[in-house]
Regions:
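Active-site activation/catalytic loop segments of kinase-like enzymes and analogous catalytic loops
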Residues: 106-149, 165-181
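Pre-DFG segment of protein kinase catalytic domains
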Residues: 81, 100-103
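Active-site-proximal structural scaffolding
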Residues: 75, 79, 84, 109-112, ...
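Activation segment
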Residues: 94, 99, 107-109
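ATP-dependent phospho-/nucleotidyl transfer catalytic cores
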Residues: 3-83, 95
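Regulatory N- and C-terminal appendages and interdomain linkers associated
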Residues: 15, 57-76, 152-181
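Generic, well-ordered alpha-helical scaffold segments in large soluble proteins
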Residues: 4-7, 66, 85, 119-122, ...
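Catalytic-loop signature of eukaryotic-like protein kinases
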Residues: 85, 89-92
Length: 181
């Protein structure tokens, strides 16, 4: 993931051969408005009450506005290519032990925090995520820099990661209450 993000970090290709890609904020807005994603995310959040911590569930009315704010923040952050749907079923390992991603229909231009938050929050058990997330983010930052990305302070990366957890949550909750259309 860091190789992808580093390769296209603030790349001229984003305004050139990849200029056809939507930004993450535009992609999210189109999905929320045209596909009814926004209401379904809220319904799904409420249907997941049993698995959402009580202190978070009490703030249910704040979740969608916070999600929109986190998506909007992408407009002012440095851009790269983001896959945007990096859950485990979209990963594979090649015969020579390299990792790859499939299902590129959500690919867009945005901040790498989107993919990082999504992959860590959807791929790890809660206890493992809590135990490993800081180390994994530090490793990601090292690889990002080694592949052409910025030298990002951990505190900044931690904030990007946490802000983008709202979008990861929103991307998953509609599966609990699919739109009847």
């Amino acid at each position: 993931l860091a190789k992808l993000h580093g390769k296209y970090y603030q790349s001229a290709a984003l305004q050139g051969e990849l200029s056809y890609l939507n930004t993450w904020s535009d992609f999210f807005t189109i999905t929320a408005n045209e596909a009814g994603f926004g209401p379904q995310a809220d319904i799904g959040f409420r249907e997941a009450k049993e698995v959402i911590p009580a202190n978070l569930f009490k703030k249910a009315d704040q979740i969608w506005p916070a999600t929109l704010a986190s998506v909007n923040a992408h407009k002012s952050l440095p851009h790269t290519v983001v896959h945007s749907d990096v859950h485990l079923k979209n990963w594979y390992i090649t015969a020579n032990k390299h990792m790859g991603l499939s299902d590129w229909q959500c690919m867009c231009v945005g901040h790498w925090g989107r993919d990082l938050a999504y992959v860590l929050s959807t791929s790890l058990a809660i206890g493992d995520r809590r135990a490993w997330e800081k180390d994994l983010i530090q490793y990601y930052l090292k690889e990002l820099k080694a592949n052409g990305g910025p030298d990002t302070p951990f505190g900044d990366a931690w904030n990007y990661y946490r802000q983008n957890l709202f979008g990861a949550l929103a991307w998953w909750t509609p599966v609990l209450s699919p739109n009847p259309d």
